[in-house]
């Protein structure tokens, strides 16, 4: 039977698939729109599965907070290119998934992907956009009597901070989260640095100080001073506050009686993902010539 341009247009709008694909499945389905959609979904899912092996190291970080700001989630959703990372449908998927995770109290990305509707939507978007899409990681923070602070920088860095204490405010939560985004602390307090890390850093400092030729007692003081400086550089409470470097984050928090940082999490798009090497233009051309 003849397939009209209007039918093709409707199927394209409903599915996001290409014009020729829509015309083909409409012909096979003899004009049955729902059957054609099922055919596209089946073929789209197959395409999505093939793309799953491709490296997805671009993407976005999104956060979601409950109305009382006592719960929050941060989610990383990856794709292959910066172009798709700015796509409205991709961004909507990320935002909706974060909202769903918050509403359902989900603790990790695996729990989110266990939802058949989420996985179906992800695979449908893979088919539509032509790139592998991954809900890579999710973390959920909660406080009993305080606030969760959230900050997202350029969709590429996202932070949640759990502040416990009645005096904690939304502004303080956001400020501390912003600081974490910028300063990359590794722990909350200097005392949380592992003994192994301390010993490793101390050995490095001893080696460096030994070359100075100074007396042993002076070297010991040098090592102690440098080690304390290092601890304050990697611990949140010891770092100079980004909005007011004349005081530390610890001093900022102390100005809010009874408030303490329980936990923080910082996600950055693609961190820890080994990207596939990109060949330069000349190499790509040579590969094509040799393959022809």
From Swiss-Prot:
Region of interest: Involved in Mg(2+) ion dislocation from EF-Tu: 81-84
SUPFAM superfamilies: Elongation factor Ts (EF-Ts), dimerisation domain, UBA-like
Keywords: Cytoplasm, Elongation factor, Protein biosynthesis
GO cellular component: cytoplasm
Signal peptide: none
InterPro entries in the cross-refs: EF-Ts_dimer_sf (IPR036402), Transl_elong_EFTs/EF1B (IPR001816), Transl_elong_EFTs/EF1B_dimer (IPR014039), Transl_elong_Ts_CS (IPR018101), UBA-like_sf (IPR009060)
GO MF term set: translation elongation factor activity
A Pfam family: EF_TS
Cell location: Cytoplasm
Record's function text: Associates with the EF-Tu.GDP complex and induces the exchange of GDP to GTP. It remains bound to the aminoacyl-tRNA.EF-Tu.GTP complex up to the GTP hydrolysis stage on the ribosome.
Family: Belongs to the EF-Ts family.
HAMAP family the record matches: EF_Ts
Protein name: Elongation factor Ts
The species this protein was found in: Acidithiobacillus ferrooxidans (strain ATCC 23270 / DSM 14882 / CIP 104768 / NCIMB 8455)
Lineage: Bacteria, Pseudomonadati, Pseudomonadota, Acidithiobacillia, Acidithiobacillales
Gene that encodes the chain: tsf
């Amino acid at each position: 039977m003849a397939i009209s341009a209007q039918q093709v247009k409707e199927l394209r709008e409903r599915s996001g698939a290409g014009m020729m694909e829509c015309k083909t499945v409409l012909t096979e389905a003899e004009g049955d729109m729902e059957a054609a959609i099922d055919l596209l979904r089946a073929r789209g899912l197959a395409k999505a599965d093939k793309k799953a092996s491709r490296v997805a190291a671009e993407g976005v970080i999104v956060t979601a907070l409950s109305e009382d700001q006592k719960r929050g989630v941060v989610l990383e959703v990856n794709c292959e290119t910066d172009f798709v990372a700015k796509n409205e449908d991709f961004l909507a998927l990320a935002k909706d998934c974060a909202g769903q995770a918050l509403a359902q109290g989900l603790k990790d990305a695996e729990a989110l992907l266990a939802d058949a509707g989420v996985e179906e939507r992800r695979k449908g978007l893979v088919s539509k956009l032509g790139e592998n899409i991954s809900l890579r990681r999710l973390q959920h923070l909660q406080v009993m009597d305080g606030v969760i602070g959230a900050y997202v920088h350029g969709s590429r860095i996202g932070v949640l901070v759990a502040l416990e204490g009645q005096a904690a405010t939304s502004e303080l939560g956001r400020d501390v989260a912003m600081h974490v985004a910028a300063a990359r602390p590794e722990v909350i307090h200097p005392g949380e640095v592992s003994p192994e890390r301390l010993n490793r850093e101390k050995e490095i400092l001893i080696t460096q100080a030994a070359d100075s030729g100074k007396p042993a007692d002076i070297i010991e003081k040098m090592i102690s001073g440098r080690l304390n400086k290092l601890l304050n550089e990697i611990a949140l409470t010891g770092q100079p506050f980004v909005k007011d470097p004349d005081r530390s984050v610890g001093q900022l928090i102390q100005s809010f009686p009874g408030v303490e940082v329980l936990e923080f999490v910082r996600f950055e798009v693609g961190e820890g993902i080994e990207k596939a090497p990109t060949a330069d233009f000349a190499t790509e051309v040579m590969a094509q010539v040799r393959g022809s």
